[in-house]
Amino acid sequence: MEKLPTFEYLEEKAKESRFLNDPHVRRLVELSEDRSLFEKSPEYLAQLRRDLLRSSLDFFARNSEFYQKLFESQGIDPSAAEPEDLAKLAVPSDLLRGNGIERFLLPNRDPGGFTFRSSGTSGKDPVRIYRSPLELVAMTKANANLFEYVYGDYLKPGQGLALFLAAEELKNHLNFVAFVDLALQYKKIKLIYGMDLAHDASGGPLWKKLVPNKQKILEFVRSRDEPKLFFSAPAGVHLLSEQFGSLGLVKRIIYKLATGAPPINLGRGGTIVTGGGSKGFQVPEYDVIVREARKVFRAEDPSTGKEVPVPFMDVLGMTETLTALLDKYGVMQKIPHPLQEVFLLDPKTYKPMDDYNKDGLLAIFDPLAVSWLEVFIPGDIVRQIPSERYYGREFIYVRRLTEEEGWNLQRACGGTLEELMYRGGALQ
């Protein structure tokens, strides 16, 4: 299996990009690490995204006859394009299965990158998306900045400790794991993987089950580093909460003496970060997971040191997108990176819709992608609500489209991790 390159390697390879002399790409590189974007007004950012849309379409038309003809056939003039034009260009994710991405890739794209694959749990060919080193560096910096905004504080390089309740091999396969791994490398924060992958000796799928590595989990629990960041599918949070919460008095005392837990103290700035939300496989609703976890996990305000309910963040990311949407439980709904154009389509007509508090089909345009024009429909229903934050809107996740609605379901990263934990017996 192809291995995810290190962030250090990607940074060096990105310097060799053939597109660095292109004004559009140079601007993207600068914007990907611009933290001040989160302080801009919704109007300013909407104008910026429109400018990037136009320069992006121009970039692809200059570098690909395929895109030049596509824009002409759709009656789109790159120099006059509007966000409403994106609905004409949005690609359903099902078209990206197998080698579907090939027709959309620039023929002169940068080499030396990495191909991400979706989970493949639907029984169909997984979605495969190629990312150049330049794109992966931009992705890492942009996602780290978005994370810090939603987290509410700056993560000081080299400070803190993270636990990911997943096997390290999955960073070579699932986007959520790769997002986290690269971002923590960028911030120089140590990451511990708390599970092992049990391979299926008979062949077939890459894995059969995930099993907890108790020593690595205890290393995280015992550590006094701050902040402590706990990354997991919702099922993993449920697993630890249930196991520590169900201890009898004697076992609770023994565990407390040996490990200092329960409660599991995440310290100043400690946070739980889940991926993909609760998929409803065999775990409770997300509200229940949060409530039960807060009985077992403890955290402190990063400024005052006073105990606070453990903060929860959730990541909505897809194989097809460079930057994710993040939320913070009880504080904000899902919010995109300032550069990402998130728009809704009517589920029946696929026409753009601007209504608030109405179910719409999620569609995304990410201008940071320069190997293919990243405008796609992942197959999720969301609602948008007005917001006073930089984006002017926030998004509430509702559900996946069903097969009856003409969509082949593909479990997201969080749901895949959840399923693997059950296969391994970890959640029995």
Feature roles, as predicted:
Residues 1-43, 51, 55-58, 183-428:
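Active-site glycine/GP-rich loop and adjacent strand/helix microenvironment
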Residues 17, 22-23, 63-65, 173-175:
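Serine-centered coil/turn micro-motif
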Residues 52, 110, 139:
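Short, glycine/acidic-rich beta->alpha junctions
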Residues 119-175:
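Conserved adenylate-forming
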Residues 5, 47, 58-117, 125-132, ...:
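Active-site diphosphate/adenylate-binding microenvironment
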Residues 63, 67, 172, 236-237, ...:
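Short phosphate-engaging motifs
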Residues 59, 66, 70, 142, ...:
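Amphipathic alpha-helical segments that form well-ordered structural scaffolds
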Residues 112-124, 180-187:
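Short, compositionally biased "basic patch" segments
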